[in-house]
Amino acid sequence: MNYGLTHTPSLTMSECLVLGVFSDLALPDFATAIDNEQKGLIKKLCQRVPEPGNTVWQTDVEGHSLLIIQCGKKEEFSANSLQKRVGEITEALIKQRFSSATVCLPRLNQESAEWQLEQMIVQIDNLRYQLLDFKTKHAKSHKLESVIFHLPGATEKSLEMAKAIVTGVEFCRDLANMPANICTPTYLGEQAISLSKQFDQISCQVMGPEEIKEMGMGALLAVAQGSDQPPRLIDIHYHGNKNSTPVILVGKGITFDSGGLSIKPANAMDEMKYDMSGAASVLGVIKACALLKLPINLIGIIASAENLISGSAVKSGDIVTTMSGQTVEIINTDAEGRLVLADALTYAERYNPDFVIDIATLTGAIIVALGNIATGYMTRDEQLAKSIERAANESQDKVWRMPLDEAYQDALESPLADMINAGFDRSAGSITAACFLSRFTEKYRWAHLDIAGTAWISGKKRNATGRPVPLLIQLLRHVANSR
């Protein structure tokens, strides 16, 4: 996809010129010039779009097309309005099968041109993204391949930053959408190694069952033992500032989750290929950071396995010893994500991080609580909470803080081991899952992102979203600016 900037938009620059207009202001100078050339055509078309979101097309204007979209009154043109207009424009361009467009939308009052450009590119790229296509007997879908923006105040630097972000998001989506027979733990490790070959600032180590066993990662091995696919622990570093204290992202990499012996319902089990979306987001963020050349030290740790059923699969009631030395009674084999994360979070201690954020499609309970709008997050660190909230607001990648009170820890008590891996009932499922993880994070500042509701869209049009890559990149940009 090509994105660019222009100071002098014209009808002939692309297949379609998109012009956003205010109901209470005159046309901008460049639009007035085009209107004069076309003998008042634009002003006539504007009379046919009285309400915000109204659109009107004019085809075959010097062999090109013109789309007018009403943006309402200037003072009422908000970030939310921008999001709606960009969505309507993108869907219209794709429906009309345009390959290129020049988009001229008014500036927001409250935000910088750099922020507005970034949001427009992220949204357009999100809507034009197409699933990996394994079909053999039909023509490939039409693609919108080039969008040029006219946005006074936007710079080439902000354009390149936006392009880096969408590249990271796309990489995350491609990995998450990959079928589980291709995207195995081994494949995830290969993708991490590939990043280290693409960028000099990235190094990577991928560890297999022997190394995992030597480190005492009994929880990760327990989850993996029911599958013929060997587990992987991926340790990937972005060296943007080797002298700074590292930030660590820990990703859940369950490349397929049948639930194990606590088997999931058949309905929508195919979507359990998305249970590695946390891992995909970690790799997407690291790729974007390398493109952005952020001056930070970032480490990604991914615990990857398949959770399947076999004669050797872990059983309900089994007790395992984690890397931390704590023992866990596994009462539910479908609560496997927290098991692999427990060992990965303990592994993170060796780097003495500034803070750690784990990203995981962890619980169905968070979907019941928040749906697919906001990612649920938990932390006991108020400074980290403020940083996450700020990054979420700026990136428009929404979050909602859930409680992490000590009282919830009682739900994890076991008569046989240090803890059970899931509560005996369904109450507060997302919170007790985070409480479980908190027992492995006492040596550093930590936050948990439960992306089970936001990592993908379910149903016939199932598709990975790439979240929370925009949120995490924005957070890391603030970290970079503070050092």
From Swiss-Prot:
Gene3D superfamilies: Leucine Aminopeptidase, subunit E, domain 1 (3.40.220.10), Zn peptidases (3.40.630.10). Its main location: cytoplasm. Mn(2+) 1 binds at D257, D334, E336. The active site is at K264, R338. Presumably involved in the processing and regular turnover of intracellular proteins. Catalyzes the removal of unsubstituted N-terminal amino acids from various peptides. Its cofactor is Mn(2+). The gene is pepA. Belongs to the peptidase M17 family. InterPro entries: Leucine_aapep/pepB, Macro_dom-like, Peptidase_M17_C, Peptidase_M17_leu_NH2_pept, Peptidase_M17_N. One of its GO terms (biological process) is proteolysis. One of its GO terms (cellular component) is cytoplasm. Binds 2 manganese ions per subunit. Keywords: Aminopeptidase, Cytoplasm, Hydrolase, Manganese, Metal-binding, Protease. The keyword Cytoplasm applies. This is Probable cytosol aminopeptidase. GO terms for molecular function: manganese ion binding; metalloaminopeptidase activity.
